[in-house]
Amino acid sequence: MSRMPRYKLTIEYDGAPFCGWQLQPALPSVQGALEAAALATCGEAVRVHGAGRTDAGVHALGQVAHVDIPKPFRADKLRDALNAHLRPNPVAVLAAEIVPDTFEARFSAVRRHYRYRIANRRSNLALDLGKVWRVPKPLDTDAMHRAAQVLIGKHNFTTFRDTECQAASPEKTLDVLDVIRDGDAVDIITNARSYLHSQVRSMVGSLVWVGEGRWTADDLAAALAARRRSACGPVAPPEGLYLMQVDY
């Protein structure tokens, strides 16, 4: 018997209405919305596997998933059918392609790219409410960028991971952590092969403390070296975080 065709999906979503990517009983999830759309499309229950298990409120412009569909579809037809059944959820399948059955959205990934958006202004948010973190106190983004380089490379990131994180090891290798300002918009760009639970938001919150003058780069280095969750700065809220792209 021939194997079911495997499809790679590229997905964007607004994370606000969801408990996160991962299925949870009686709660709306991105994975659940996609699996319901797949069931409506092919008539059978299937499992959709994501590259990144984003938390509640976190958005994606380039999440990747794979799914085995029990009957063959042309890739563009599958994309359109899933999108039709996803409405009115704020989830869109941007692309679908047939891939070998050895492809795994999570385990085949070699790099994940995240962007954290900050609005550094005193005024309330009108258009970007729920899409950025408004920080009213002026931020020294040059100091933030310099301090961020302390975290580049392979480290024990225990300080910057959630206490509920289930990763076997706290060691991760951070390839990029840049802080970029354009007017009152501050973007924190990072990429790595993988991250610990809440690692990006924990790093962002600590960098904001640097930007506000509460911490220096040495304080950030000391927090990293402490390998203790209580040494972390505040955890940035989820609404500013975006999974931008996954590389294979």
UniProtKB/Swiss-Prot annotation:
It holds the Pfam family PseudoU_synth_1. It catalyses: uridine(38/39/40) in tRNA = pseudouridine(38/39/40) in tRNA. Gene3D superfamilies: Pseudouridine synthase I, catalytic domain, C-terminal subdomain, Pseudouridine synthase I, catalytic domain, N-terminal subdomain. Keywords: Isomerase, tRNA processing. Substrate binds at Y114. The active site is at D55. Belongs to the tRNA pseudouridine synthase TruA family. This is tRNA pseudouridine synthase A. It comes from Rhodopseudomonas palustris (strain ATCC BAA-98 / CGA009). The lineage of its organism: Bacteria, Pseudomonadati, Pseudomonadota, Alphaproteobacteria, Hyphomicrobiales.
